[in-house]
Amino acid sequence: MNGIEIFIDESGDFGAYEAHCPYYVVTMVFHESADSLYDKLEGLEYSLDVLGLAEHCIHSNPAIRGEDEYFGLPLSLRRKVLLNLMAFIHNADFRFKCFFVKKCEAGDETALFAALKDVIDPFVSANFKRLSAYSTIKVAYDKGQRQISRLITQTLEERFDNVQVVKILPIHSRLSQVADLCCTIKRIAQRLSDVGSLNKPELYFFGTAKNFRRNWLKSLMRSEWK
């Protein structure tokens, strides 16, 4: 079987718990190497160009909140940016998986690392045969946090003999933005489940919790690794 690429991104840090950032999230985006991304990427770039945002680097949370480079941009434009990225996910047939840890339940860096390993290990074990069938498993990570590099070693490199950790290439920048959108939508869904409501910027962007679940979360979940 052809190879598979796994792009890994993270949200959060290994510092102390803070109420505004209650979760640490590791996101894996999967793409079979045999399927070329270039024509799909061209479609995304064209869509952004039409919106007047050529070569724009998409940041999902600021787009939803209307912050940073999205401050003052019309709501309709911000929605179109994320909808175009969502369409790219479906067109490229990506699969993703998000792994959550509540930082309030992990007292320190060691406990947080162990908690992340505890949620990733069962997934890898359950999919061991499926992943082993690929000729190569190429893992792309920007090595932004040494703990995640160590996690990759312990959960993937030490368990498979066909893992190659590769450098981040320019084509991976859009995959990073895919991982960011997956993480953002799933994080909002997790908090919605925990507290029962969206915050004010999210309500303005999505309209209602029901609309968020039906038109955004449900759409994204079509691409979750199963």
Range-by-range predicted roles:
Residues 1-226:
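Phosphate-ester processing/binding pockets and catalytic centers
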